[in-house]
Structure formats: structure tokens, C-alpha cells
Amino acid sequence: MAAQAAAAAQAAAAAQAAAAQAAQAEAAESWYLALLGFAEHFRTSSPPKIRLCVHCLQAVFPFKPPQRIEARTHLQLGSVLYHHTKNSEQARSHLEKAWLISQQIPQFEDVKFEAASLLSELYCQENSVDAAKPLLRKAIQISQQTPYWHCRLLFQLAQLHTLEKDLVSACDLLGVGAEYARVVGSEYTRALFLLSKGMLLLMERKLQEVHPLLTLCGQIVENWQGNPIQKESLRVFFLVLQVTHYLDAGQVKSVKPCLKQLQQCIQTISTLHDDEILPSNPADLFHWLPKEHMCVLVYLVTVMHSMQAGYLEKAQKYTDKALMQLEKLKMLDCSPILSSFQVILLEHIIMCRLVTGHKATALQEISQVCQLCQQSPRLFSNHAAQLHTLLGLYCVSVNCMDNAEAQFTTALRLTNHQELWAFIVTNLASVYIREGNRHQEVLYSLLERINPDHSFPVSSHCLRAAAFYVRGLFSFFQGRYNEAKRFLRETLKMSNAEDLNRLTACSLVLLGHIFYVLGNHRESNNMVVPAMQLASKIPDMSVQLWSSALLRDLNKACGNAMDAHEAAQMHQNFSQQLLQDHIEACSLPEHNLITWTDGPPPVQFQAQNGPNTSLASLL
């Protein structure tokens, strides 16, 4: 009986202890949930009350909570401080604690890997890339049983290597990710990894590897049956790569079917409902880009195509649409990719403005690019060479040849991109040709490096055609007219094959000029009239000015007084428009940008008293 009584007493004590423990746990849970609720209320207030949110989360620690709650609270604090404050030191401390504690807790993957992901982001922001890499590698190593996080961390480390310009390591990681996705049965995420790898291979110009990869991607995308928005977004990614591949190669005509498919694809996406995607396979929980970002991207590649083809009014129309969409998006979204899209759009429309005779507007837009680059060192690093190239083109348009040379030389120093290098050298050579005998040795060296008959450095059809044009221009200025005609006919053949309208117009008018000098007025007229028509269609103000002057002189020589008078009137109108624009551009304070050749973009510009450049070339 005594034993039974003792057992009963023990059982009662145990039950009492268990009840006390349960009550304590319930109380702990209630205070924790209360603090968490307050913190979330303050975080989501309008405007957010971040200081109060942080106080509520910090109040968790004096209660000596269990490890799970402690680790999660450190993660929440680190996340709030990282995203909403500039206190990176405290954010780092909390995230490091979350990562350390969570590794000791079994089945705590979400907290563990989110802490690793955020912490590596913070390290990169602080330029501690060497701390971010091993952290991500360890997280990747221990996340193989968690498909979503394993894929996400692989993408993150690949992106880090890409930002460091280590594309080989990035491609290797994306290859690992593609194979892992295949093993866990996620064809969708496998396609994302492969398309990302294809994008990097295009950047590296490894075209022999790109073609089979894109073919495989095309098959995977077409065969995958899943959420319609995810499927269409894969198709957009695939088609964007194809279109940019064609445009990089200067194949403006060949790209049209792909571009049309891309435009139809984005129209399809815009009609689909944004239902929340909840795939059964956790490895499928990825999305390439938001729908709105994809729309801007399709506008962007359409602008690139229109610019290369010489449909400048169309380029203007799509740029306006894209910039309007970007302004709306940037009110709600601070994603860095939006600023990149904006800069690339502005770079293209600036070139359009310079061709259409709107130099003052182009200069103000160059200044806008400078301001965007001032806000982001990475953006400036990626676009500095393009910015100096645009300034060089502006300098040519206002006849500041010494400044043009300085800008192009600076751009060459800042780029290792082959296509951009060839574009800059082609334009620099044209500056030296116009300058006469001042730079003969340098000019000969440049022309040899972009010799389209022998070892042209890039595969771009458009740039090779432009190199033939520059050789023709040089031969014309040297008085070697037969040689000039051969080069220009080669340009015409290549530009006609791919609908490169600006090159066609420039080649026709220069051929017309050669025939005029040689006294072959009929053949000259046969070149100049279509050049004028094409230049009006683009519209290209410089070619129109040149063509109208030639038509005036041709008609005078042939005794066609009325036609000569009409052409003279056209020439006068074009001259006045260009002269007025020239004066306006050179009077802007931003015109001082032409002297900037070193360091980050200047913050302010001093206003000038008036233009200080020669107008002789316009009259």
C-alpha cells in the first residue's frame, strides 16, 4: 500500500510538473506571440515605425527563449535592420547569430538558409565578398535535401561570381544547378538554370556552346506543362536571348521572326491572371522576372532593333512607352534592374536624338544617365565606357573633334567588350579621317585593327559593314575613288542584306558624292535621290543636309534651275534647324561634360556664356 501511495504521489507530482511546464510554455508562447504581433503591426504601419518594431523584437531576449525562438528573432531583427535602416553593423551581428544558432537545431531549414542568404547579401553590400563566398558554399553543401533553398543559394552564388566578372565559375554553378533540378524532377527550374547559363555564355561570346544549349532550352520550354505564366515567362527568357544574340551579331533582318514571337509572347502574358503560383515541387518556386519587368525588357529589345535598323521614330515611340512604365514601377519598386533598363533605354534614345538632329535633348539625357550612375557605383562601372562613347558622338555632332577624340580614347580605356571596342574604334577612325593629316600614323594603325577584309575582331555583321564604310570614307578623302567605290559597294551589299538603313543611306550619298566629283552626274543622281528618300524616312538630318547640298549642286551642273532652287531651299531649312539646335546644345551648362574624362560623373555643371565651337561644318 505504501508503495502504491508513493507511486500515486510520484504520478501526481509528475502530472503537476507537466501541467506547470505546459502552463509555462503557454505563457511563453503568449508573450512571444504578443511581442511578435506588436512588431509586425509597427513594421507594416504607414509609414512603418521601425524603431518600435525593433524594440518589440529585442524585448524577446530577456525572457531567455528556447533556441528556435532565439534564432528566429535574430533573423527577424537582422532582416528589419538590413532592409529598413542603415545600421548594417547590428544587422550583421543578428544575422550571424541566427546563422550560428540555427545550424545547431535540426529541421530548421527556413531560418538557417534565409539567414545565410541575407547575411551573404549584406557582406556583398559591405564589399566583403570573400566572407560571402564561403558562407554560401557551406549553405549550398548542407542544403541538398532542401530543393528550394539549394537552388536559390546556387543562383545567389552564381550571381555573385557574375558581378565579379568570373563568368566561368558562374557558368559552372549554373550547370550544377541544372543537373540538380533534373535529378529532383524540376524541368522548369532546370530551364531557368540553363537559360541563365546561356545568357552568360553569350556575354563571353562562347557561341559554339550557346547554340546547342539554346536548342536544348527550346525543347525543354516547349515540352514543359505547368503554370501558364511560368511557361510564358520561360519563353520570354528564351526569346530575349535569341533576339539579343541576333542583334549582337548585327543581323537586323534575320531577327524579325524571333522578335515578332517575343512581342506576341508578352501580349499573351499580359492577358493571363496573376494567380498565386503554388507548384507541387518546391524546386519550382522561382520566377524569372515580374510580368511588368518583362514588358519593359521587350520594349527595350524592340528599341535596340529599331535603332540598329534605322527606324528611329519607332525607337522613340517604344522608348517613351518603356520610360513611362519604368517611372510607374520605380514608385513602388527599388530593384536595381529597373535603373539598368532605364540607362540602356536612354543610351539608345540618345543615339537616335543625335541622328535626328536633337543634340540639346540628347545632351540633357546624357546628363540624366550621369545622375543615375552617380546613385549607383555598380551602374557607373558597367556603363562608364558607353557614357564616354555617347559624349564622343555628341562632340562629333557639335564639331568638337579634340573632345571627341578624348572621349573615345577614355571609352577605349574603360571597356573590354569587343563589340563596343570595335564601335568606338570605327567612330574614332572617322574623327581622324575628318581631321586630315594630323593623326596619320594612329589612323593607319586603327584601320588595320578593324580591317574588314582580313582579321575583323568581332562577328557583328553591322560593325563589319560600318568598317567597310569607314575604309571607303578614308579612300574618298585620299582621292582614291575606285578603291572607295569598292569598299562602299561592299557596305551596300551587307547593309541591304540585313536592312541596315542608316548605313545604306550614308553609303549611297558618299557614292553619289564620288560620282559627282568624277563628273558622272547621272550615276550621282541615281545614288543621291534614294539616299535622300531613305534619310527622310529614318530621319537622318546629317545625311539629309549632305544629300540636299549634292542635289543642289547636281541640278545646277545639269542646268535644272527649278530643281536646284528647291534643293537649295531644303538645304537652307536643314542648315537652319541644325544650327539652331547646335547653338542651343552648346549653350547648356551640361555642354561642359565634354571635358570630363576621368573619375565618376561630375555632380554640377557651370553655365557657359555661349557656344564656343565651330559651326563651319554645318553651313
Curated annotation (Swiss-Prot):
Cited SUPFAM superfamilies: TPR-like
Signal peptide stretch: none
TPR repeats: 113-146, 385-418, 465-498, 505-538
Tissue: Spermatocytes and oocytes (at protein level).
Region (Sufficient for interaction with NIPBL): 1-121
Predominant location: nucleus
Keyword Nucleus set for record: yes
Keywords: Cell cycle, Cell division, Chromosome, Chromosome partition, Mitosis, Nucleus, Repeat, TPR repeat
Pfam families assigned to the protein according to its UniProt record, in alphabetical order: Cohesin_load
Protein's cellular compartments: Nucleus, Nucleoplasm; Chromosome; Nucleus
Recorded superkingdom: Eukaryota
GO cellular component terms attached to this protein's record: chromatin; nucleoplasm; nucleus; Scc2-Scc4 cohesin loading complex; SMC loading complex
Subunit relationships: Heterodimerizes with MAU2/SCC2 to form the cohesin loading complex. The NIPBL-MAU2 heterodimer interacts with the SMC1A-SMC3 heterodimer and with the cohesin complex composed of SMC1A, SMC3, RAD21 and STAG1.
Role this protein plays: Plays an important role in the loading of the cohesin complex on to DNA. Forms a heterodim. eric complex (also known as cohesin loading complex) with NIPBL/SCC2 which mediates the loading of the cohesin complex onto chromatin Plays a role in sister chromatid cohesion and normal progression through prometaphase.
UniProt similarity note: Belongs to the SCC4/mau-2 family.
PANTHER family: MAU2 CHROMATID COHESION FACTOR HOMOLOG
Protein name: MAU2 chromatid cohesion factor homolog
Natural source organism: Mus musculus (Mouse)
Lineage: Eukaryota, Metazoa, Chordata, Craniata, Vertebrata
